[in-house]
């Protein structure tokens, strides 16, 4: 419906625009319609020694970003928390098994508490709803943190692609090999992972990894066979089988190129026509992409494939047999109701006949997500990126016997052009041109001063090692633990000091303490409910402030990065902190300095920590708005309710953490935007001009570049803000008006005269 409306709008826009056109505009449109296909073109390349403005901003060193809007992520997070056991595999994947068991216990306790409260609504409702709100909040935040592994569903495009694949794929179902071997390899059955899986693959894929074995017609499992390759991927729990049959050998030809392409075509030809379900369509997609990628490994995609020896037609079957034994499928299965997909499939082919090709290892990987059942578009773009990327331009000889398996994560759609630009920046970053990418830096070994040519990565590595060796404080961890214990015991302490005086506390009995702890007569259901509420508040509040401590530690590390970076051009401080030192006396040094600045600003957790900080910022504003509304309702009775006291404790603790983060962020911004460093280097250049008049022209050039760098940093740098990820301008302005209006009402009610803070520019 929306697409039809857009088409109608475009049609009417062109219709009314035609009445405004003159002859010159019509001629230009005709020229644009012809396009640039007939224009002469010649090869070009990007110069990696030049820099872009993205390098100064830091966007060159891009971080992973979610493809799904934050509104959808919020909805997914709420659903995954409410139906927590149904998404067990997803939670295990993004956390761990032990943490999942702990969270599942908290979830069951929360459900039990809600049921007991509905049966006996005696205790305060805030004691039950508080942990529930914390659980929903942190589940949503965690879903946004791991959202880079969730891909956008392709929707109708994916359905159309599957229908197109069903029309284009054909399979015979009965294909014989050249030797007519009676023991044909019939199926590939996915089994549970064995502990013998290598540590590298265990680290790369995380959780359960499927092991693949070849099953013959007789029911025995084999690893190698000389027969034709008939793999069927069987999924557990009644999932449909996916059959891939080898194509029948066609007419033999003497041309080596045709034989090689025929051998590639035989490996991936045909998928059974009876695959009609949704998962079968997905399997068809993977098989066709694999086949197209294998065929594209020739000269069509830019990868050189050299035929050193003429391949005779009588050797074709033996080549196919050798290649068939080099298949390796690694399938990762998720038991979630919303997640059932392939995680990765990898293919590598090599031969002893002398064929060599660039990028023989072809990879396919899919991350777990509830929406990737319809997402064949992602794999398509991944393969195009893989086959047409710059890494396909090398030519190597593959003579290995075993299979080489390489896995490429494909969680997000990436533009190949963007990858080319990023890799060109990484070329000089990774020492591709030592003459222009290294700087002569001074390092201290004891009391000795030595020079060394260092790159950006080497200098940043030393800085990061110094930051990692820094002993972090535990003050805010202790603050979080104290607030956690106080909030967990707050209902009991509130009833205790409200109903008992200090003299009565000396002679209080255990039964009275239990009654105050439960808030009602200590019957069994009430005692169970009170104990559950205590542990829920204790655990969930501790998790919340633990995340806040992680954010504080990250901001502290960012500040240390900026602090050490600002000391690079200072000889005394560089020696004190044992980091490299160099002056901005050359244009190349200025380039390295700017690159190092952008690189360090992008190191460490970025978006994930910003999610936590933004969520805490919004929570603080929400609590402030609720408190203002309660004060406006009746400021004399505001402190009579326990939940208002609890709101004040939360607001105080959150403000302390936010003030800490704001101060660290502001200091970090000042260190990176310290123009005094560039001004000092300009003074040093003038001092050199006085001592070396023969180099005045060269030093003047460097001085001009420093002036331009100063202006550029002032132009690009923005003031630090805590809100960033979820606080777009619309939400920010609405929140500012609402909160400041509420605060204005409170102040006006307390002071007796009207004041409007929202009209004051912030």
From Swiss-Prot:
GO process annotations (BP): spermatogenesis
Location in or out of the cell: Endoplasmic reticulum membrane; Golgi apparatus, cis-Golgi network membrane
Ranges of Basic and acidic residues composition bias in the record: 365-376
Protein's gene: Phtf1
Main location: endoplasmic reticulum
Source organism: Rattus norvegicus
Highest taxon in the source lineage: Eukaryota
Glycosylation sites: 179, 224, 363, 431, 674, 733
Organ and tissue specificity: Highly expressed in testis.
Residue list for modification Phosphoserine: 272, 276-277, 334, 336
Keyword Transmembrane helix belongs to the record: yes
Residue ranges of the TM segments: 77-97, 99-119, 121-141, 473-493, 515-535, 611-631, 645-665, 737-757
Disulfide links within the chain: none
Region (Disordered): 152-184, 345-415
Keyword list, A-Z: Endoplasmic reticulum, Glycoprotein, Golgi apparatus, Membrane, Phosphoprotein, Transmembrane, Transmembrane helix
One Gene Ontology CC term in the entry: endoplasmic reticulum membrane
Oligomer and partners: Interacts with FEM1B.
Taxonomic path: Eukaryota, Metazoa, Chordata, Craniata, Vertebrata
Membrane topology: Multi-pass membrane protein
Domain PHTF, residue spans: 6-150
Protein's UniProt name: Protein PHTF1
Low complexity: bias regions: 348-364
């Amino acid at each position: 419906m929306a697409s039809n409306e857009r088409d109608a709008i475009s049609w009417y826009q062109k219709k009314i625009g035609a009445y405004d056109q003159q002859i010159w505009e019509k001629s230009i449109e005709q020229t644009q319609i012809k396009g640039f296909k007939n224009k002469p073109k010649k090869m070009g390349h990007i110069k990696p020694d030049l820099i872009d403005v993205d390098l100064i901003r830091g966007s060159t060193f891009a971080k992973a970003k979610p493809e799904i809007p934050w509104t959808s992520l919020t909805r997914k997070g709420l659903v995954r928390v409410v139906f927590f056991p149904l998404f067990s595999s997803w939670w295990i994947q993004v956390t761990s098994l032990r943490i999942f068991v702990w969270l599942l216990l908290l979830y069951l306790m929360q459900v039990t508490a809600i049921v007991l409260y509905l049966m006996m609504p005696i205790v305060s409702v805030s004691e039950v709803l508080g942990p529930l709100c914390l659980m929903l909040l942190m589940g949503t935040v965690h879903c946004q943190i791991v959202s880079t592994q969730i891909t956008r569903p392709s929707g109708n495009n994916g359905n159309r692609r599957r229908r197109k694949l069903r029309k284009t794929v054909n399979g015979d179902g009965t294909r014989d090999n050249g030797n007519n071997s009676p023991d044909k390899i019939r199926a590939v059955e996915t089994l549970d992972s064995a502990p013998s899986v290598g540590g590298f693959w265990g680290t790369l894929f995380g959780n359960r990894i499927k092991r693949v074995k070849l099953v013959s017609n007789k029911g025995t499992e084999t690893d190698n066979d000389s027969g034709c390759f008939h793999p069927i991927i069987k999924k557990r729990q009644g999932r449909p089988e996916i059959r891939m049959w080898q194509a029948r050998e066609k007419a033999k030809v003497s041309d080596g190129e045709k034989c090689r392409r025929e051998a590639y075509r035989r490996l991936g030809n045909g998928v059974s026509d009876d695959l009609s379900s949704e998962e079968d369509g997905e399997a068809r997609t993977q098989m066709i992409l694999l086949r197209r990628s294998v065929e594209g490994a020739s000269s069509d995609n830019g990868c050189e494939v050299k035929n050193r020896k003429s391949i005779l037609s009588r050797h074709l079957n033996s080549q196919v047999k050798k290649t068939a034994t080099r298949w390796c499928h690694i399938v990762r299965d998720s038991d979630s109701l919303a997640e059932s997909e392939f995680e990765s499939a990898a293919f590598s082919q090599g031969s002893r006949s002398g064929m060599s090709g660039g990028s023989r290892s072809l990879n396919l990987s899919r991350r777990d997500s509830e929406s990737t059942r319809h997402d064949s578009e992602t794999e398509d773009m991944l393969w195009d990126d893989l086959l047409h990327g710059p890494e396909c331009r090398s030519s190597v000889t593959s003579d290995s016997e075993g299979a080489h398996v390489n896995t490429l994560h494909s969680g997000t759609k990436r533009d190949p052009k963007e990858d080319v630009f990023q890799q060109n920046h990484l070329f000089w970053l990774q020492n591709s041109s030592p003459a222009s990418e290294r700087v002569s830096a001074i390092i201290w070994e004891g009391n000795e001063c030595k020079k060394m040519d260092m790159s950006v990565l080497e200098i940043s590595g030393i800085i990061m090692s110094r930051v990692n060796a820094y002993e972090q404080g535990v003050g805010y961890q202790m603050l979080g633990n104290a607030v956690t214990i106080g909030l967990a015991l707050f209902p009991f302490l509130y009833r205790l000091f409200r109903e008992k005086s200090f003299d009565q506390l000396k002679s209080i009995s255990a039964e009275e303490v239990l009654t105050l702890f439960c808030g009602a007569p200590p019957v069994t259901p009430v005692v169970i409910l009170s104990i559950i509420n205590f542990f829920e508040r204790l655990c969930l509040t501790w998790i919340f402030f633990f995340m806040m401590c992680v954010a504080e530690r990250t901001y502290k590390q960012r500040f240390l990065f900026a602090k050490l970076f600002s000391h690079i051009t200072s000889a005394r401080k560089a020696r004190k902190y044992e980091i490299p030192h160099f002056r901005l006396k050359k244009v190349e040094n200025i380039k390295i300095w700017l690159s190092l600045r952008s690189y360090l600003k992008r190191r460490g957790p970025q978006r994930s920590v910003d999610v936590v900080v933004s969520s805490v910022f919004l929570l603080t504003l929400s609590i402030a708005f609720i408190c203002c509304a309660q004060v406006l309702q009746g400021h004399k009775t505001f402190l009579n309710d326990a939940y208002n006291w609890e709101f004040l404790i939360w607001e105080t603790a959150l403000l302390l953490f936010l003030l800490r983060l704001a101060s660290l962020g502001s200091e970090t911004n000042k260190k990176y935007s310290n123009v005094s460093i560039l001004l000092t280097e300009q003074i040093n250049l003038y001092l050199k001009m006085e001592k070396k008049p023969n180099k005045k022209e060269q030093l003047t050039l460097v001085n001009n570049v420093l002036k331009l760098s100063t202006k550029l940093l002032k132009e690009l740098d923005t003031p630090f803000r805590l809100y960033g990820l979820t606080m777009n301008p619309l939400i920010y302005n609405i929140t500012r008006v609402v909160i400041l209006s509420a605060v204005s009402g409170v102040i006006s009610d307390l002071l007796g005269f009207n004041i409007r803070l929202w009209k004051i520019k912030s």
